[in-house]
Amino acid sequence: MASAGSLDVPERGHQRPFLIGVSGGTASGKSTVCEKIMELLGQNEVDHRQRKVVILSQDRFYKVLTPEQKARALKGQYNFDHPDAFDNELMDRTLTQILDGQIVAVPMYDFITHSRLPETTTVYPADVVLFEGILAFYNQEIRDMFQLKLFVDTDSDVRLSRRVLRDMKRGRDLEQILTQYTTFVKPAFEEFSLPTKKYADVIIPRGVDNMVAINLIVQHIQDILNGDICKWQRGVQNGRSQKRTLPGQGDSGGLLLQGKRTHLESSSRPH
């Protein structure tokens, strides 16, 4: 992606992108997993207009807050983890345009002021799009666009510690962070995000630390980029994928197999 400028860039021949949804709780490592996939595919060094794989975050689609909502947000009293916090109409429209091979201007969001910025980021046509967010699977219309759904399953204590460190870097005090977590973040995860885990085709315990899972996913994205998309599309109709099982560490096969949803290893501790 690039900061918005001229959009009159010659488009590549239209080929419907392979859309991968990546969900999981706050600070579970979703964006880190996506970034590691990009790194292993060698896409970080490629010009943004020529990248075959791009990452898009659900965080960019937070609604514009009213003055009253923004005042509450600055006090840590607004629920950003609720489905109603997102502009699902804009999200749906943007993903549809991306699937149609269009060059798209995507909103930018300031997490310090809780504001949608006037600047946008340009997303150019790509072969594979990774869309990550805490509620990426919550809305059915959006969920059904994904041809592959990954759920990053990280221990709740680890997620909390990461959240504290991240929010303190954004200038928030510890008491506000913990109050927001217990009041909004944890209940919203249990009510809205965790139940969508059942829609995942692949569950990735421990996030980016689980390199067995990451390497297998990278391997199959390479298959897609090499034109061998049929490995993924067996059983896929109208953007929906059946539950599949990836080969385990001791397996030599490289195909995704239809069957139960993949859980690449047991979580060390349940949520």
UniProtKB/Swiss-Prot annotation:
<comment type="similarity">
    <text>Belongs to the uridine kinase family.</text>
</comment>
<dbReference type="InterPro" id="IPR006083">
    <property type="entry name" value="PRK/URK"/>
</dbReference>
<dbReference type="GO" id="GO:0005524">
    <property type="term" value="F:ATP binding"/>
</dbReference>
<keyword id="KW-0418">Kinase</keyword>
<dbReference type="Pfam" id="PF00485">
    <property type="entry name" value="PRK"/>
</dbReference>
<dbReference type="GO" id="GO:0005737">
    <property type="term" value="C:cytoplasm"/>
</dbReference>
<feature type="binding site">
    <location>
        <position position="209"/>
    </location>
    <ligand>
        <name>ATP</name>
    </ligand>
</feature>
<comment type="pathway">
    <text>Pyrimidine metabolism; CTP biosynthesis via salvage pathway; CTP from cytidine: step 1/3.</text>
</comment>
<comment type="function">
    <text>Phosphorylates uridine and cytidine to uridine monophosphate and cytidine monophosphate. Does not phosphorylate deoxyribonucleosides or purine ribonucleosides. Can use ATP or GTP as a phosphate donor.</text>
</comment>
<keyword id="KW-0067">ATP-binding</keyword>
<feature type="binding site">
    <location>
        <position position="172"/>
    </location>
    <ligand>
        <name>substrate</name>
    </ligand>
</feature>
<dbReference type="GO" id="GO:0004849">
    <property type="term" value="F:uridine kinase activity"/>
</dbReference>
<feature type="binding site">
    <location>
        <begin position="24"/>
        <end position="32"/>
    </location>
    <ligand>
        <name>ATP</name>
    </ligand>
</feature>
<comment type="pathway">
    <text>Pyrimidine metabolism; UMP biosynthesis via salvage pathway; UMP from uridine: step 1/1.</text>
</comment>
<dbReference type="GO" id="GO:0044211">
    <property type="term" value="P:CTP salvage"/>
</dbReference>
<dbReference type="GO" id="GO:0043771">
    <property type="term" value="F:cytidine kinase activity"/>
</dbReference>
<feature type="binding site">
    <location>
        <position position="109"/>
    </location>
    <ligand>
        <name>substrate</name>
    </ligand>
</feature>
<dbReference type="GO" id="GO:0044206">
    <property type="term" value="P:UMP salvage"/>
</dbReference>
<feature type="region of interest" description="Disordered">
    <location>
        <begin position="240"/>
        <end position="271"/>
    </location>
</feature>
<feature type="binding site">
    <location>
        <position position="163"/>
    </location>
    <ligand>
        <name>substrate</name>
    </ligand>
</feature>
<protein>
    <recommendedName>
        <fullName>Uridine-cytidine kinase 1-B</fullName>
        <ecNumber>2.7.1.48</ecNumber>
    </recommendedName>
</protein>
<keyword id="KW-0547">Nucleotide-binding</keyword>
<feature type="binding site">
    <location>
        <position position="180"/>
    </location>
    <ligand>
        <name>substrate</name>
    </ligand>
</feature>
<feature type="binding site">
    <location>
        <position position="81"/>
    </location>
    <ligand>
        <name>substrate</name>
    </ligand>
</feature>
<feature type="compositionally biased region" description="Basic and acidic residues">
    <location>
        <begin position="262"/>
        <end position="271"/>
    </location>
</feature>
<dbReference type="InterPro" id="IPR000764">
    <property type="entry name" value="Uridine_kinase-like"/>
</dbReference>
<dbReference type="InterPro" id="IPR027417">
    <property type="entry name" value="P-loop_NTPase"/>
</dbReference>
<keyword id="KW-0808">Transferase</keyword>
<feature type="compositionally biased region" description="Low complexity">
    <location>
        <begin position="246"/>
        <end position="259"/>
    </location>
</feature>
<feature type="binding site">
    <location>
        <position position="114"/>
    </location>
    <ligand>
        <name>substrate</name>
    </ligand>
</feature>
